[in-house]
Amino acid sequence: MILELNNIDKSFGEKEVLKGVSFTAEGGKAFGLLGRNGAGKTTSIRIIMNVFPANGGEVLLDGKPIDYHKIGLGYLPEERGLYPKKLVIDQLAYFAELKGMSAKEAVRAVDYWLNRLGMTEYRNKRLDTLSKGNQQKIQLITALAHDPHIADISLE
């Protein structure tokens, strides 16, 4: 699987934030966008994730425009998107089910990721009792539990 951005342009009103951005990322490999604040990293990611469209250029997956109705996406934004009063297992299963997994598949996938990240002891704990670092791991599981084709992990 190959993700390509070709000559992406994006403006917000009169402010041009991306001009001719192009890159390729191969499936199964880590890929990072590095740059100073305001360089367009988050804007590029949000275009890939279909949060908003580019003004020009194209986003391709294996040489074809992405069909966002058929592709699985996992997104871990910089901002936290957790429900602090919910139990870890309930929250993770809920988000996995929103991505189309059955309740049984969701719990199985969540348990796999909790184990893989050394988080099984927090399975039945409320999120607001976890450290910020462990909350970030829980949010990571929300992005990965449904085995997405593309996973976007935005870190500060």
Regions found by a protein language model. Give the residues of each.
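ABC transporter nucleotide-binding domains
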Residues: 3, 10-156
